[in-house]
Amino acid sequence: MTAYKIDHIGVAVVSIDDALPVYRALGLEERRREEVPSQKVVTAFLPAGESSIELLEPMSEDSPVARFLMKRGPGIHHICFAVRDIEAAVRDLAGKGFRLINARPAPGAHGKKVVFLHPDSGHGVLIELSEDAS
């Protein structure tokens, strides 16, 4: 398994609309906004070179992002790495003893399959893997 690029950096926000002005001031523009019911969030992607910033707004108080915001406030939520074969990545990481939040890929933004490594395995960083089979 090889993570071949940083796909995006997820930023938890209370409101995407309230967060956009600072990113627009940096020259970034929102490309796509969508609801991701499996994660209970609305996402907005702002391309930045070969990567993107993903703004994450909770859809409900019981979403993982809402809990993150209540505990830590707005800020960097996760780093996402692109992988070609997410099933192989899950087997490889689990076989090496890393703790996965979801051992089965779930639907993420843009319909991509995603898994998350627990922050305990990522030295305090929530790591997302997203399958990009292209």
State what each model feature region is.
Residues 5-7, 26, 30-41, 59-77, ...:
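A cross-kingdom feature marking solvent-exposed beta-strand/loop segments within repeated
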Residues 6-13, 23, 46, 53-56, ...:
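Short, structured motif recognition centered on aromatic/hydrophobic residues
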Residues 14-28:
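An N-terminal domain-start capping segment
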Residues 44-49, 53-54, 81, 90-134:
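Vicinal oxygen chelate
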Residues 50-53, 60-62, 86:
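Short, charged/polar surface micro-motifs in flexible loops or helix N-caps
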Residues 72-73, 86-91:
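Long, charged/polar, surface-exposed segments that mediate recognition or autoinhibition
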